[in-house]
């Protein structure tokens, strides 16, 4: 069973769906693409092998989890991998079509060995 963060969590997770709806309603977008999870090889270009494994295996220490701000549960790990995959996909689409964005992107607080501010990768 996929563990999820609760609806009572202070991070506004629904904002990503709302952004997509707004772009559709305003006729800003023509296409949406479904990203796949970012590969270990790609993640390892920006993050340490140890940190990636601690996230994937959910073995990050309590202080690291606290810095991120999310519980380290299956849904957070999957969402983080897919959101990062979305940024990779958006960059490829932008190179092909001139413009693209990741509506679940924008998290930019993680560094090589740790996450922070609701940003895992």
Where are these regions (language model features)?
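HDAC/HDAC-like amidohydrolase catalytic core signature
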Residues: 1-121
């Amino acid at each position: 069973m996929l563990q999820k963060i609760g609806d009572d969590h202070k991070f506004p997770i629904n904002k990503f769906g709302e952004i997509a709806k707004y772009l559709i309603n305003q006729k800003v977008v023509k296409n949406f693409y479904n990203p796949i999870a970012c590969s270990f090889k790609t993640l390892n270009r920006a993050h340490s092998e140890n940190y990636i494994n601690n996230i994937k295996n959910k073995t990050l220490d309590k202080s690291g989890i606290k810095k991120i701000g999310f519980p380290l549960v299956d849904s957070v790990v999957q969402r983080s991998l897919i959101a990062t995959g979305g940024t990779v996909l958006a960059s490829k689409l932008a190179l092909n079509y001139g413009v693209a964005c990741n509506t679940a992107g924008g998290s930019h607080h993680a560094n090589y060995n740790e996450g922070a501010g609701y940003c895992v990768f």
